[in-house]
Amino acid sequence: MIVRNLKYLSYELYRRLEARLWYSHVHYNHHDRRFELFFGWFGKRCDKPLEIYVSHAHNTWKDSSMTIQLVLNDEVLDSVVIYPGEEFPEHWFEILCATLGTIRDRDIL
């Protein structure tokens, strides 16, 4: 996926996670530009949503690069500098799957 805007980058993460995770509700907050996912594991439902979103840290106008962050529940999991036309950061999918798997295994939900 070519990175064109943050909403589509966020959507790509969710689309890829769909195959591995069950969730009961998705809400897109236009004001904060973030998705809120209400996840469940093995039929359990959590009361508080897990928030996964892509935040825009800053632009560098000199070379048109943009720093974006992968955020889970207000914790920055990774930060990447991208340039126009660059591909989706593939390793983000693995980071999220590993992190969410850890959350499930600890039975926090």
Annotate each PLM feature:
Residues 5, 16, 34, 105-107:
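Positively charged, low-complexity intrinsically disordered regions
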Residues 5-24:
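Amphipathic alpha-helical segments
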Residues 10-13, 71-109:
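Ampiphathic alpha-helical segments that act as solvent-exposed interaction surfaces
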Residues 18-72:
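Amphipathic, interaction-prone secondary-structure segments
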